[in-house]
């Protein structure tokens, strides 16, 4: 066991040889390296697979072992301060290592097919391999300074990958937005680290936890200063994990290639913020104000993310807001002290969301031959529909991933989300109500994504869409195309006078909501006959989907309670995950309830599943094939006609759509207040610099310049003139001096 721990430091370094080899190849033999570029995918996958084997072995040994601090190198700054670099292996590290390596391997395999025809294939593999290295280094860090170093590397890699297609202005803008937003959090993290170093004189986790256990309860340190420093540390996690109000970068990050969208939102960048809070939770748990603030931010984020996902048309942006909401659940769990539930949901969500993102990439690939390579068309769900006939494997995997995220048993996310909901109700009914209501919203918007993408008919070939030829109910006018005369312009899912609408499209247009259109459709929307249809992707893209499907089906069982001996009327709560986390400090809420009553578990499960099924049902009514059935029964129309508050309900739906489609107006608020405000300040500074500073400088120098210009014409270049003026000046001097 100790022999294995000795070489744990190798895990973050394993992907580096491939990165350096590709770099040297591009410098020394660029032509051969580019011609044989797809060969480099194999060593990238191989080395990360070796890292995964190491991680699994460490995790197995960690179950019955203890945390290991190992120092590799010390840099002595002076006699009083030194920086020690090493690694920390504990259950949290083990979980993250397995998560990063498994998802990373599958994303690399998927990327080989997804990026095969891209000119930046090698550059992409260099970036993504370095991304994995940075994240592996972050989770094995033994102190705050190491975490900050790898934290910045993760941010740098995300900047490069989000702006991978940097020739597209929208992608360049997106990576800048992600960089600037995360700099706010990174600055807070750095200040928090420096603050705790000033308090303790150390950057080691053990010293910080000593403060939490001994000094803070006994008023050994300034509680206000400690709370401020803890808040600054939390600010770093807020930006990295896309929590309100620093969440605005995450939807725009979808401008990068789909594989990196999957990696960012499943196992790397957004997981870094959750990891940081989980690592420092022994410190935060001793500061009740910070814990309450964490839970509040998580609650706001989970609800906000769900509402913003309701009306998105871009499939990747919809999934991005879903990620934001699920990260809010994890943040809420950490804020209420439910450490195990947060990590459990981190695991289950990672595999489910990776499955959904890679599935969306398969959908996008299948749509590009029809609509072109412009993301605002190939990712637009309004142009999809009926894909279940053309890409059945992708459809099946996407459906299972959707149901998992909706919380349908026995899929992965059901177990973790149900645990968070139960703990939130125990902690506060306020948090429980919002979390439970959002669970229903999650089922609604996730099933909406599935139905718009796979249900009905392929809408790209029609100017108006309806699931039945005769029906005008919910005919969808194409985004960006001329709307026919028979279609109501006031609704997204527009109808004739006899139809019913769901969301209003008559909204203020905000700059930045629409993206620059590049490329063109390869088929005519008005064509009656077309032979272009979507097709299933290659095996290198389907294989990761099938493996992730297995994880989605079975990974949730590690959190299922099993009997460890009766205690009273309950069953001892012992799970594989809790056994795995036994060596960690037992500071979570679960410790207060050593057993769970089976009746209580079933009751909570029934409640959460009922909410999920209700959300699925509502989504199916509005977006599924069932709406033609309800129209034939005149069920919906009779409800609307007999409802005296129809106009009020229409206005409510219009406002909901406007709020969701325009991202809650948060982006436009930031643009007007911060972006335009800072630009106005820079213009004012420029005016002051040129008008005042330059004015004073030029005002002093200008008279001297003018006098010199006048004097230089006096001499004329004649020596006799110089002697004449010299004698005159001497005579005047002597005259005044002698008189």
From Swiss-Prot:
Q: Topologically, how does it sit relative to the membrane?
A: Multi-pass membrane protein
Instruction: Give the Gene3D superfamilies listed for this entry.
Output: 1.20.5.2700
**Gene Ontology CC annotations of this record:** chloroplast thylakoid membrane
The protein's location, in the record's own words, is:
Plastid, Chloroplast thylakoid membrane
Q: For this UniProt record, give its keywords in alphabetical order, as a comma-separated list.
A: Chloroplast, Membrane, NAD, NADP, Plastid, Plastoquinone, Quinone, Thylakoid, Translocase, Transmembrane, Transmembrane helix, Transport
Name the GO terms of the biological process aspect: ATP synthesis coupled electron transport; electron transport coupled proton transport
Q: Main subcellular localization, coarse class?
A: plastid
Any S-S bridges, and between which cysteines? none
Query: EC?
Result: 7.1.1.-
Name the top EC class. Answer: translocase
Does the record's keyword annotation contain Oxidoreductase?
no
The record's listing under Pfam families reads: Proton_antipo_C, Proton_antipo_M, Proton_antipo_N
The reaction(s) catalysed by this protein are:
a plastoquinone + NADH + (n+1) H(+)(in) = a plastoquinol + NAD(+) + n H(+)(out); a plastoquinone + NADPH + (n+1) H(+)(in) = a plastoquinol + NADP(+) + n H(+)(out)
Q: TM spans, by residue?
A: 9-29, 39-59, 89-109, 125-145, 147-167, 185-205, 219-239, 258-278, 280-300, 327-347, 354-374, 396-416, 425-445, 542-562, 610-630, 719-739
Molecular function terms from GO:
NADH dehydrogenase (ubiquinone) activity; quinone binding
Q: Where is the signal peptide?
A: none
Subunit structure comment from the entry: NDH is composed of at least 16 different subunits, 5 of which are encoded in the nucleus.
What does the UniProt record say this protein does? NDH shuttles electrons from NAD(P)H:plastoquinone, via FMN and iron-sulfur (Fe-S) centers, to quinones in the photosynthetic chain and possibly in a chloroplast respiratory chain. The immediate electron acceptor for the enzyme in this species is believed to be plastoquinone. Couples the redox reaction to proton translocation, and thus conserves the redox energy in a proton gradient.
Q: What NCBIfam families is this protein classified in?
A: NDH_I_L (TIGR01974), PRK06590.1 (NF005141)
Give the family this protein belongs to, as stated in its UniProt record: Belongs to the complex I subunit 5 family.
The name under which this protein is listed is NAD(P)H-quinone oxidoreductase subunit 5, chloroplastic
Source species of the chain:
Triticum aestivum
Organismal lineage: Eukaryota, Viridiplantae, Streptophyta, Embryophyta, Tracheophyta
């Amino acid at each position: 066991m100790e022999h294995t721990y000795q070489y744990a430091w190798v895990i973050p370094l394993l992907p580096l040889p491939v990165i350096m080899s590709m770099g040297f190849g591009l410098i020394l033999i660029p032509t051969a390296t580019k011609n044989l570029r797809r060969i480099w995918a194999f060593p990238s996958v191989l080395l990360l697979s070796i890292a995964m084997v190491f991680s699994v072995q460490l995790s197995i040994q960690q179950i019955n072992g203890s945390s290991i601090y190992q120092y590799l190198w010390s840099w002595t700054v002076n006699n009083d301060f030194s920086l020690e670099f090493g690694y920390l292996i504990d259950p949290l590290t083990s979980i993250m290592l397995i998560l990063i390596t498994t998802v990373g391997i599958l994303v690399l395999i998927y990327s080989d097919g997804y990026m095969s025809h891209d000119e930046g294939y090698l550059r992409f593999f260099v970036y993504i391999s370095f991304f994995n290295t940075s994240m592996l280094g972050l989770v094995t860090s033994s102190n705050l300074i190491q975490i900050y170093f790898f934290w910045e590397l993760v941010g740098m890699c995300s900047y490069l990958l989000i702006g991978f297609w940097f020739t597209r202005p929208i992608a360049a803008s997106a990576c800048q937005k992600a960089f600037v937003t995360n700099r706010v959090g990174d600055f807070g993290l750095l200040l928090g680290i420096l603050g705790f170093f000033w308090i303790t004189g150390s950057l080691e986790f053990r010293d910080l936890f000593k403060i939490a256990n001994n000094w803070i309860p006994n008023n050994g340190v300034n509680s206000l200063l400690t709370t401020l420093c803890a808040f600054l540390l939390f600010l770093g996690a807020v930006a990295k994990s896309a929590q309100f109000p620093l969440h605005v970068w995450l939807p725009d990050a979808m401008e990068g290639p789909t594989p990196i969208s999957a990696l960012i939102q499943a196992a790397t960048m957004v997981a870094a913020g959750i990891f940081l809070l989980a690592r420092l939770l022994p410190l935060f748990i001793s500061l009740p104000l910070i814990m309450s603030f964490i839970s509040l931010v998580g609650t706001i984020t989970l609800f906000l993310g769900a509402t913003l996902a309701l009306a998105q048309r871009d499939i990747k942006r919809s999934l991005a807001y879903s990620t934001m909401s699920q990260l809010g659940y994890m943040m809420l769990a950490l804020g209420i002290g439910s450490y195990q539930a947060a990590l459990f949901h981190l695991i289950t969500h990672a595999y489910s969301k990776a499955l959904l993102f890679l599935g969306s990439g398969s959908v996008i690939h299948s749509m590009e031959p029809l609509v072109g390579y412009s993301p605002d068309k190939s990712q637009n769900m309004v142009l999809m529909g009926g894909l279940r006939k053309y890409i059945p494997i992708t459809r099946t995997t996407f459906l299972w991933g959707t149901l998992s995220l909706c919380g349908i048993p026995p899929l992965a996310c059901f177990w973790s989300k149900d645990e968070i909901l139960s703990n939130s109700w125990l902690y506060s009914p306020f948090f429980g109500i919002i979390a439970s209501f959002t669970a229903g919203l999650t089922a609604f918007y996730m099933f909406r994504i599935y139905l718009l993408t796979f249900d009905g008919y392929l809408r790209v070939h029609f100017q108006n869409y309806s699931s039945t030829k005769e029906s005008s109910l919910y005919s969808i006018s194409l985004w960006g195309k001329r709307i026919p005369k028979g279609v109501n312009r006031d609704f997204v899912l527009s109808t004739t006078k006899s139809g019913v609408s769901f969301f209003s499209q008559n909204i203020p247009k905000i700059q930045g909501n629409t993206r620059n259109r590049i490329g063109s459709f390869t088929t005519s929307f008005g064509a009656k006959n077309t032979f272009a249809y979507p097709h299933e992707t290659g095996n290198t893209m389907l294989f990761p989907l099938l493996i992730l499907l297995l994880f989605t089906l079975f990974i949730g069982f590690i959190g299922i309670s099993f009997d460890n001996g009766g205690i009273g009327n309950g069953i001892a709560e012992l799970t594989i995950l809790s056994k795995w986390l036994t060596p960690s400090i037992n500071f979570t809420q679960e410790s207060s309830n050593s057993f769970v009553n089976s009746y209580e578990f079933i009751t909570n499960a029934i409640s959460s599943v009922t909410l999920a099924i209700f959300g699925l049902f509502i989504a199916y009514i509005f977006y599924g094939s069932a709406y033609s059935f309800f129209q034939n029964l005149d069920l919906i129309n009779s409800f609307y006609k007999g409802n005296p508050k129809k106009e009020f309900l229409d206005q409510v739906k219009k406002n909901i759509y406007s709020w969701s489609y325009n991202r809650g107006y948060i982006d436009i608020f930031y643009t007007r207040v911060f972006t335009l405000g800072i630009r106005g300040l820079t213009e004012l500074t420029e005016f002051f610099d040129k008008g005042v500073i330059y004015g004073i400088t030029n005002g002093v120098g200008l008279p001297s310049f003018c006098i010199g210009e006048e004097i230089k014409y006096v001499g004329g270049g004649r020596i006799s003139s110089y002697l004449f003026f010299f004698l005159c000046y001497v005579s005047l001097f002597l005259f005044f001096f002698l008189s």
